[in-house]
Amino acid sequence: MEILACTASYSPDMELVLGMLDELETKLPAYSHPVIHSDQGSQYQSPSYQARLKEMELVQSMSRKGNCHDNAPGETIFNLMKRERLNRVKLHSLEEVQQELEDYIYWFNNIRWSNKLNYTTPVKYRDCVMATI
């Protein structure tokens, strides 16, 4: 699993999730139509979010109510991010949080190998898969 977009905010509002979709749009190849998974937060059920997903040709997937296991891969990444980076530093501003997230995502995608991806990084794994298509 590769992290493609991440935004930070003081509150989980529409500006946050729509900003994440804007960032994601700049990184997706035109031919890709991935599944985007979320919990059942009100911002993910809003008409503006769902319209934006449709406009970007993304497939929406939502966890069932009260079932954290539906998003196990995403929860695993959040746990790793907290354990490997965020719990080890003291951050004083939203800008510092955003910078730490960007640094971690680069490391996670390009340097940190995963045994579940044949002991390679998410970017190398994706590139190998795409080369076979």
Regions found by a protein language model. Give the residues of each.
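Charged DNA-binding/catalytic regions of mobile-element recombinases
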Residues: M1-I133
